[in-house]
Amino acid sequence: MSIYDEKKEKVITMTVTLILVVILICIKVTHFVIIERPLKQCRIVSAYHLTVDTNGAQIDHSWLFEKDDLTYIDIAKTFEQTYFVTDYAGGSGDSGALNELTIAFGETMDGMPDIRITVSENGYIQINGKRAYPLSLKYAGNRLYGHLLECLQDGADRQQ
């Protein structure tokens, strides 16, 4: 084997090693940025308050934030601070009406939200999304509902 062949083999080995290292770094960065990104770094792309009757028919649907008018809020505050909101004075006068709050966090390349959290005042919590974030919900459903609503309204007031 000549010196030229040894150098060529060494160059090929180094090139393959370098390519593998770059691929591994890209995978790790993608994993951290896309999958392990903390919830508090996501932006709220939309949030709306929905009131439905006992049959599930929509009574009132009011946007807290429109997609064209994004509001940035420290999401960690939503889950870490306690607002003792026991009732939300709104919606319809129907005694069987159920208030529901949906918040969409983040945004994927196709424009869909990363994750949606829907909290009803009866305590029902639904989490949907393309990625599963490690959420720790510290509150009962109705307290979390009022708490999220208060934080969103507080954020809207601060934006104006």
Question: What is the role of each PLM region?
Answer:
Residues 2-160:
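Function-determining sites in protein domains
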